[in-house]
């Protein structure tokens, strides 16, 4: 007997959703939520945030004529319900997989995705740009930005709101508040007030009243100002929207973000209002799945889990992530040095600092999504004789370029930059790849750069940085794990700046490996030796200071050399190294293995490496082919 179709089975695009009666929307929300739970329990992905926006997403596509009306999602990891309703339901099981759906909005995937996102705080700027463009060409469509309560506190979001309040363009910002941080008045009074504020009757007669006051001689303008202050004061007492009104936004809320029918009715009213409007809704991360409701941080991003109780595989306990090494080592150092501080821009969990924060809360500074502030803040701490470890993802450090230059490197302030997720990050994709950092770090005055090729290197560098105060220093490492048994957290090893390792010496070709490329370099060297070639393998962990003289000496007796760099070829280490080669050695350079200057899409690191021929086997094949072409034979 054929299974009866669900409501969701009949919906592939928003136009079909809009044909569903309003009273059926709660059932659709239930089915969308169950679809996400069923799918992600098998494959993993961003979880709690997506469960929290199901009703909002259904309401948005029900009320607005998408894609003509523009939805701009901030960050974007909460767009799985959006993807389900915009023609990608049957592909959700490929999300974050190689050649599958992106975990974020992506223009190439769908006309419903306006921008490729991944970083926080951009949506209001983009929505305002859309609204300004619309009005310039005299078109007619709605523009809606959806932003979370953490993202709206970013400097960029506040700058955009300030500009939007000045321009007075018709646009809607939906504040998705799931932490209750600015939401104390959810209930009948705020609901009653919102019904008044959004009514056509109220807004029409308010405009008439204020227009009348402007025409009154002498007392008119003063009376208008008085009544506006009374109106604002009344709303400030009953709602938390004073800040947004001060920025020039009409404020509605807080509203229950899980009452889809009320959301639809409220959005229908809000879209008829003039000027910039902020609709504040309250949601719960993990809504509808008990384990995620109880621990939304744990279930923010999940691996495959048992649907019945949310149990996830603990993974390989013999390995430890580079991020966890950082947190563990900083805790060890802080035990004996009260001047150490760890700084992170809203990435305590991701940067491996959870246990550190619990053990040394007064030494941990989570500055929020404020990368620019975090770098200047760290620089100033050094002026107070504090030893700051600035823990940040490579992709987010690019947001603080001006502060890196002016507030740290030009003044030679000894900030310790601990740069996580450098190189290829895998499933997070193009907006999170850490492929730019070496290019700009090596261009900064005074900045020392260390690229560990293993976990012990990272431990040794973190310990060495504690006492190093001559300049700022950056260490960068991949999103990867290492064998725990290979590590000694208490070993006292003195790093020697400007040194490198030589694993083997040969005469045909030298492989110069930069940091995390060492594993592929070792595989390539073994393959080349199996083909009868004599290989030099150099593990170049110090980029600045660079042991240029010693490196040139190593290359004297080889016929040619290649560089292996997990960065963009045009903005990595190649130019930096070649500028320091002798003329004789410079002529021996044949190739850099790195990423071409194009967006590097998501997939497991191994798959991405194979696509771009950066795995050991592919490197060996290409090197052997070049040597054969140039008559360098075994």
Curated annotation (Swiss-Prot):
EC number per UniProt: 2.2.1.7
Coiled-coil region: none
Keyword match Transferase: yes
Cofactor comment: Binds 1 Mg(2+) ion per subunit.
Record-listed Mg(2+) binding positions: 149, 178
Domain of life: Bacteria
Gene Ontology cellular component terms for the protein in this record: cytosol
Keyword Nucleotide-binding tagged: no
Subunit-level organization: Homodimer.
Name under which the protein is recorded: 1-deoxy-D-xylulose-5-phosphate synthase
Native source organism of the sequence: Leptospira interrogans serogroup Icterohaemorrhagiae serovar Lai (strain 56601)
Protein encoded by which gene: dxs
């Amino acid at each position: 007997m054929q299974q009866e179709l669900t409501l969701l089975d009949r919906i592939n695009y928003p136009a079909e959703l809009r044909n569903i009666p309003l009273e059926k929307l709660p059932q659709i929300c239930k089915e969308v939520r169950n679809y996400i739970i069923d799918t992600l329990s098998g494959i993993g992905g961003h979880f709690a945030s997506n469960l929290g926006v199901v009703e909002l997403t259904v309401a948005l596509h029900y009320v607005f004529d998408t894609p003509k009306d523009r939805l701009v999602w901030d960050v974007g990891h909460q767009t799985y319900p959006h993807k389900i309703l915009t023609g990608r339901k049957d592909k959700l099981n490929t999300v974050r997989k190689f050649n599958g759906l992106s975990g974020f909005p992506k223009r190439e995937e769908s006309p419903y995705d306006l921008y490729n996102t991944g970083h926080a705080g951009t949506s209001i700027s983009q929505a305002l740009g859309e609204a300004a463009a619309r009005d310039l060409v005299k078109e007619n469509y709605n523009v809606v930005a959806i932003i979370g309560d953490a993202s709206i506190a970013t400097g960029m979001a506040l700058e955009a709101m300030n500009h939007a309040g000045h321009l007075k363009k018709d646009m809607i910002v939906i504040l998705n508040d799931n932490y209750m941080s600015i939401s104390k008045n959810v209930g009948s009074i705020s609901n009653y007030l919102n019904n008044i504020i959004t009514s056509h009757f109220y807004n029409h007669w308010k405009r008439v009243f204020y227009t009348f006051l402007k025409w009154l001689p002498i007392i008119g303008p003063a009376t208008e100002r008085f009544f506006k202050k009374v109106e604002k004061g009344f709303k400030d007492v009953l709602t938390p929207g004073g800040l947004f009104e001060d920025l020039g936004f009409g404020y509605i809320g807080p509203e229950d973000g899980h009452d889809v029918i009320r959301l639809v009715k409220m959005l229908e009213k809000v879209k008829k209002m003039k000027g910039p409007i902020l609709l504040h809704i309250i949601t719960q991360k993990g809504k509808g799945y008990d384990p995620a409701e109880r621990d939304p941080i744990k279930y923010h991003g999940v691996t495959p889990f048992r649907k019945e109780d949310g149990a996830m595989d603990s993974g390989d306990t013999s390995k430890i992530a580079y991020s966890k090494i950082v947190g563990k080592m900083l805790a060890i150092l802080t035990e004996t040095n009260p001047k150490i501080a760890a700084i992170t821009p809203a990435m305590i969990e991701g940067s491996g600092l959870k246990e550190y924060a619990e053990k040394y809360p007064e030494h941990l500074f989570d500055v929020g999504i404020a990368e620019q502030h975090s770098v200047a803040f760290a620089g100033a701490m050094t002026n107070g004789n504090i030893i700051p470890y600035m823990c940040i993802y490579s992709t987010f450090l690019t947001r603080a370029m001006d502060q890196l230059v002016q507030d740290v490197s030009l003044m030679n302030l000894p900030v310790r930059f601990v740069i996580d997720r450098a190189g290829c990050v895998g499933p997070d994709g193009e907006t999170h790849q850490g492929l730019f950092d070496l290019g700009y770090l090596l261009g900064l005055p005074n900045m020392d750069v260390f690229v560990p090729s293993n976990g012990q290197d990272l431990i040794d560098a973190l310990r060495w940085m504690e006492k190093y105060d001559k300049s700022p220093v950056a260490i960068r490492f991949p999103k990867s794990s290492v064998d725990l048994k290979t590590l000694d957290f208490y070993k006292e090893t003195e790093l020697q700046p400007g040194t490198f390792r030589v694993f083997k010496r040969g005469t045909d070709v030298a492989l110069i490996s930069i940091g995390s490329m060492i594993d592929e370099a070792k595989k390539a060297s073994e393959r080349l030796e199996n083909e009868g070639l004599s290989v030099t393998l150099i593990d170049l962990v110090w980029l600045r200071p660079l042991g240029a003289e010693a490196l040139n000496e190593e290359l004297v007796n080889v016929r040619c050399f290649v560089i292996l760099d997990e960065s963009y070829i045009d903005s990595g280490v190649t130019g930096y190294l070649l500028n320091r080669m002798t003329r004789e050695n410079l002529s021996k350079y044949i190739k850099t293995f790195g990423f071409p200057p194009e967006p590097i899409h998501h997939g497991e690191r191994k798959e991405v490496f194979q696509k771009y021929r950066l795995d050991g086997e592919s490197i060996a094949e290409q090197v052997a082919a070049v040597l054969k072409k140039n008559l360098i034979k075994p």
